[in-house]
Each structure stands twice: as C-alpha cells, then as structure tokens.
Amino acid sequence: LYNTLNSIKWMATIQHATGIAEMTISLSRLLKSVSKGNERLVPLQEEFALLNDYFTIQQYRYGGTITLDVIWIEDERLCQDCMIPRFTLQPLVENAIFHGIEPKGCAGSIELTIKTDKETGDVLILLTDDGVGMSDEQAKQILTEPSAEQAGAKFRHVGVWNVHRRLQYSFGEDYGLSVDAQLGQGTTVTIRLPGNYDKKENET
C-alpha cells in the first residue's frame, strides 16, 4: 500500500499536481501512525504531527476555507514532556469540522490552546471552533455512553465519548474531556492530561 501511495505521489509531482502529492504524503504518514499499535501513549509533539497530516487533507477538501491555529500559553517543552493517547486530537478536530463548521455553510476556524492548570500541574488543551454550537443538553449528552442504536448510527457524540473514555482509561477518572458550547456560537472541548505522567508506564 505504501509503495502504491508513493507511486501516486510521484505521478502527481511529475504532473505538477501539488495538492494531490501533499495529500498522498499526509495519508501515507497517517496510515503508518495507525499501524503503530505498540505504543498506547505518544508525546504531544507526535500527536500534533499526526493532526497536521490529517488537517492537510481536510484543507484541500474544503478549499482552504477552514483554518487551524495552535496557541501556546506555556513553554513549548510541554510537547516533549506531556503524553497523550494516540489519535486523541484527530477525532475531536474531525467532529468540529463535520458537526460544527460544515453545517453553517461558510468558512470556519479551529483554535487549539495549550496551557497548564496552575493548581494541579495538569496540561489543558482547549479545542475551540466557531461552528453551529449546541444546546446545554446536547453538550451533556456528548460525554455519556451512547446506546447500541446510537453507536450503530454513528451519532455525533460517539467518537467524542470514545476519546473521553480512552483518556480516563489511560490516566484515571480525574482526566478526560469537558464540553462547553453555545447554540449558534461554537464549541470548546477541553482535554485534561497529567503534566507529570511517567513515560515508563507506557512501556508496560
């Protein structure tokens, strides 16, 4: 499969189809990340690289009408020191695009803010979109376990709930997601991660 993607990339390069070449490179890296099943947790820096590959593909799909900005409030060393379950950010950004920005029918933006909780030392990642938002009831439902019927129908909150549960499985009940939204004004999903997680635990 990788050889096939590489062939597509070179054909696109020869024909000066830059967009196709870049999307193919990003897809190849994403597939390699999926195949890495031996590491449950990865440095935040690696997770952002994966997210960048995913977003590159989406930018071409939406003609550059969606932007993704990363804002660092604290030291960028958080990227190396903080550990996060692989494929945590991508499903949340995907949800923001498909269920937040796309339904409003115009350009949109997603902002990632990384900071530390001064009281606990935890790392907080705030993912904010300017999409259609949701009601308080919908925001509460997102973090509740979906029914079998909802899971089969791929309801909006299934992917978000899965991310929430993986975070709690990895770090404990004190960690995971929280959702703050206003109907018609966008949504903010906050990821809480331990700031001093022992990387050696990931090897067991």
Predicted regions: what is each one?
Residues Y2-S178, T188:
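Two-component histidine phosphotransfer core
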Residues L177-T204:
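C-terminal end segment of the histidine kinase catalytic
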